[in-house]
Amino acid sequence: MKNVVIAGYARSPFTFAGKGALKKVRPDQLAADVVKGLLTRTGVDPEDIEDLILGCAFPEAEQGLNMARLVGFLADLPLSVGGVTVNRFCGSSMYAIHMAAGAVRMNAGEVFICAGVESMTRVPIMGYNPMPHPGLYERYPEAYIAMGETAENVATKYQITREAQEAFAVESQRRAAAAQAAGKLDDEIVAIASDDGPVDKDGCIRPESTAQALAELKPAFDESGTVTAGTSSPLTDGA
């Protein structure tokens, strides 16, 4: 079997949903801009690309239809480049890589673009009109469990204390801020055009976070739980 390699990587900045610098940018355009930036950086011939595999957790509205194909058009890829949108919730873009790697090893193509995009501003969690199956919800409500509740379950199962979560969160923010200040994230970010000018910096880093401040927050998902807004991933827009 062929060996599989990741030959290049690019991303947009990640900014807060609803109030960040990317809130007015459509997700399909956001993904297309990143694809364009990736091709410019790598010098890959678009004619060699077999498929664009795009992960998206809530593929509806501006993220709807087969968004991967539409992103290909917006990124000026040749018509010969296919497009498929993958939904495995939080693992969607990771699974796009798994799919491409399997295809390469099976000789079903040599060059793939694996991507992911989510605008939590433009398409809210659970989408615009969630309609759980009544029978399934009654019999197995866990099928519709939210990630925050899952985090509580994981913390309980593996005995991860609130203090340990908050220490990890503070260190994560510190490292992210240090990396940004040192310019270590610059090479991977594609600047995105917005109404207020180019967006080229992550907007979700909070270096002012402290263990003392996080300890004052109320649990976000279970009133007797340990997970708070300070130890949860923020709602973001990005690709």
Model feature map: region roles:
Residues C56-E110, P141-E149, E208-P234:
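Conserved catalytic cysteine-centered active-site region
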Residues V86-V117, A155-L185, G238:
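Active-site-proximal alpha-helical scaffold in enzymes
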Residues R105-Y158:
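Flexible glycine-/small-residue-enriched beta->alpha junction loops
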Residues A17-K19, G64-L65, R122-Y128, G203:
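Short acidic, glycine/serine/threonine-rich loops at helix termini
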Residues A10-P13, K24-D33, R41, A164-A239:
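N-terminal extracellular/periplasmic Venus flytrap/periplasmic-binding protein-like
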Residues A7-Y9, F112-E118, A193:
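Short beta-strand segments
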Residues T40, V44-E47, P78, R105-M106, ...:
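Structural alpha/beta core scaffold segments of enzyme domains
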Residues M1-A57, A61-V71, A75, G82, ...:
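Conserved active-site "lid/cap" helical segment
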